[in-house]
């Protein structure tokens, strides 16, 4: 019994180390989302901080469309970060059984 508890504790500590490493890796990434066939792009960090917005000058005459494209590009980048985070966090918890419905911090 004690061996099982010790093994579980080691497994949990290893998972915690892996999760911390994955979070550090995620924080370092930059992802670019785009909309309007690439006419608008938004670059976000892994923490979803906006680093850059690029807008094709031809779009400045239609502010409403530009607003929609910026939002779509932001959402595209955000979804890419979510997918990357899920992948990295899944690798960090490989082999560790999480209870049904339990979600990671991301």
Swiss-Prot record:
InterPro entries: YbaB-like_sf (IPR036894), YbaB/EbfC (IPR004401). This is Nucleoid-associated protein Smlt1015. Keywords: Cytoplasm, DNA-binding. It comes from Stenotrophomonas maltophilia (strain K279a). It comes from the Bacteria. Residues 81-106 are annotated as: Disordered. Binds to DNA and alters its conformation. May be involved in regulation of gene expression, nucleoid organization and DNA protection. Belongs to the YbaB/EbfC family. The keyword Transmembrane does not apply. One of its GO terms (cellular component) is cytosol. Its main location: cytoplasm. HAMAP family: DNA_YbaB_EbfC. It is found in: Cytoplasm, Nucleoid. Homodimer. One of its GO terms (molecular function) is DNA binding.
